[in-house]
UniProtKB/Swiss-Prot annotation:
One GO BP: proteolysis
pH-dependent activity: Optimum pH is 8.
Compositional bias ranges of the Low complexity kind: 72-93, 140-172
Entry EC no(s): 3.4.-.-
Protein role: Cell wall hydrolase that cleaves gamma-D-glutamate-meso-diaminopimelate bonds in peptidoglycan. LytF is necessary and sufficient for vegetative daughter cell separation, and also seems to play a role in cell autolysis.
Lineage of producing organism: Bacteria, Bacillati, Bacillota, Bacilli, Bacillales
The family this protein is said to belong to: Belongs to the peptidase C40 family.
Organism name: Bacillus subtilis (strain 168)
Record: active site: 400, 449, 461
KO phenotype (gene knockout): Cells from an undomesticated strain (3610) lacking this gene grow predominantly as chains, whereas wild-type cells grow as separate individuals. They do not show a reduction in the rate of swarming motility.
Subcellular location as annotated: Secreted, Cell wall
Entry GO CC: extracellular region
Record protein name field: Peptidoglycan endopeptidase LytF
Region (Disordered): 70-93, 137-176, 218-239, 286-306
Induction behaviour: Expressed in the vegetative growth phase under exclusive control of sigma-D (SigD). Expression of lytF is heterogeneous in the exponentially growing cell population; it is ON in single cells and OFF in long chains. The same subpopulation of cells that express lytF also express flagellin.
Length: 488
């Protein structure tokens, strides 16, 4: 009996795959245990779509012993092309590391993604750890000549523009080096900017950043910031109000109104980043006298009620913050935390008392939580069919944790973490409910894949087939299921 395998969702080694070269310069292989379309595409430097098309596949499920044609394996042509490229100029070689993307590598070596793909003969954006990429050298005579003309143009134009800009920008910009656990949201709050401003200032096309990346930031003493502050101070007398809509988050609202998330928190005396549909927020004006008096009273109280809390299994900063009626940011600052990942047994200093009146607000909390879950699931389903992209966090392509990051930020503000990172920050539950997160051990031990539970054994996730709805009772998922976690 043939054993079926779910495509693209395992990373065990391909052992003994049979390869036969045909006269037409195509290759055929026989599927072995552990093979998947994604893995074969990576091994033979093609794409899942090309494999599916070449073999007229109507499903991504493979059978052991099945014969597949590998498209476009023109070894002689590729070798001659590479040798000619080497002759034209000496190429540097870069080895892909875990977490890399073409965009990151192109930025690091001051290239465009298109140049990188041309230089390496790539037909897709998929790369794998350990893969060797050429990162310098001549792509073609036409591209090199265009580069020369562009460089001549850019050198003159950039020198003009930079000289014009330097007088105003040099004094008004600083730099920030990205640290482990950082996100654009966290950095924007740290340097009192909006995420949109950070992205424009650094020409970022996505929210993905990497450790040791240097970002330009606005100096607090710049002319622009003083202008903004003066205009804001003029506006404070007329308070603007905003009613929260489905899909909103503090980050989204802050960007729309050119504010920081922290400013909205302060003005509205928010204890958490959780919003609910219909909630009215003030968007201009000073933090209310009530909030300042309450903050002063809480600081007075906290000075006498500082407690040490030991992290338990299932805890997250958000869960602990709710328990002690403080914000996650207050816990971060109090404990100098560089990341939101907590360890069981870790000691945290908390200023405040565990809330005794949680039951009175439970009905409001339940209704707002339900609304957020519905919004999140709607946002997730709207992405059905979006292709898989390693490290992707946008509708142009997602990986599993990038998909979770995207949909969670439709209803709250979270950092970009791995599947294991989200596992460590959420509360464990014995059985998943709608809106909970289900985790699986796929290509390595521990949580390496995550999806959102929809009920009736189904969950939505981004796997190698793209964003799809899968069934947990499928033999592949059933044997790899780790457990469920709750965020809301």
């Amino acid at each position: 009996m043939k054993k079926k395998l779910a495509a693209g969702l395992t990373a065990s080694a391909i052992v003994g795959t049979t390869l036969v070269v045909t006269p037409a310069e195509a290759a055929t292989i026989k599927v072995k245990s552990g093979d998947s379309l994604w893995k074969l595409a990576q091994t033979y430097n093609t794409s899942v779509a090309a494999l599916t098309s070449a073999n007229h596949l109507s499903t991504t499920v493979l059978s052991i012993g099945q014969t597949l044609t590998i498209p476009g394996s023109k070894s002689s042509t590729s070798s001659s092309t590479s040798s000619s490229t080497t002759k034209k100029s000496g190429s540097s070689v870069y080895t892909v590391k875990s977490g890399d993307s073409l965009w990151l590598i192109a930025n690091e070596f001051k290239m465009t993604v298109q140049e990188l793909k041309k230089l390496n003969g790539l037909s897709s954006d998929l790369i794998r750890a350990g893969q060797k990429l050429k990162v310098s050298g001549t792509v073609s005579s036409s591209s090199s000549s265009s580069k020369k003309s562009n460089s001549n143009k850019s050198s003159s134009s950039s020198s003009k523009s930079s000289s014009n800009k330097s007088s105003s920008s040099s004094s008004s910009t600083g730099t920030y080096k990205v640290q482990l656990g950082d996100s654009l949201w966290k950095i924007a709050n740290k340097v009192n900017m909006s995420i949109a401003e950070l992205k424009v200032l650094n020409n970022l096309k996505s929210d993905t950043i990497y450790v040791n990346q240097v970002l330009k930031t606005k100096s607090s003493g710049s002319d622009t910031s003083s202008k903004d502050n003066s205009s804001k101070s003029n506006q404070t007398s007329a308070t603007t109000k905003y009613t929260v809509k489905s899909g909103d988050s503090l980050w989204k609202i802050a960007n729309n109104y050119n504010l920081t998330v922290q400013q909205i928190r302060n003005i509205n005396n928010l204890k958490s980043d959780v919003l609910y549909v219909g909630q009215v927020l003030k968007l201009t004006g000073k933090a209310s006298s009530g909030s300042s008096s309450s903050s002063s009273s809480s600081s007075n109280a906290s000075s006498g009620t500082t407690t040490t809390y030991t992290v338990k299994s299932g805890d997250s900063l958000w869960v602990i913050a709710q328990k002690f009626n403080v914000t996650a940011q207050q816990i971060r600052e109090k404990n100098n935390l560089k990341t939101d990942v907590l360890q069981v047994g870790q000691k945290l200093v908390i200023s405040g008392k565990a809330s005794s009146s949680s039951s009175s607000g439970s009905s409001n909390t339940t209704s707002s939580t339900s609304a957020k879950i519905n919004t999140m699931i709607s946002a997730a389903k709207a992405q059905l069919g979006v292709p898989y992209r390693w490290g992707g966090t946008t509708p142009s392509g997602f990986d599993c944790s990038g998909f979770i990051y995207y949909v969670l930020n439709k209803v709250t503000s979270v950092s970009r973490l791995t599947a294991a990172g989200y596992w460590n920050t959420m509360k464990s539950v014995s059985q998943p409910a709608v809106g909970d997160f289900v985790f699986f051990s796929t290509y390595k031990a521990g949580p390496s894949h995550v999806g959102i539970y929809l009920g009736n054994g189904e969950f939505i996730n981004a796997n190698d087939s793209g964003v799809v709805i899968s069934n947990m009772n499928n033999s592949y998922w059933k044997q790899r299921y780790l457990g469920a976690k709750r965020y809301f």
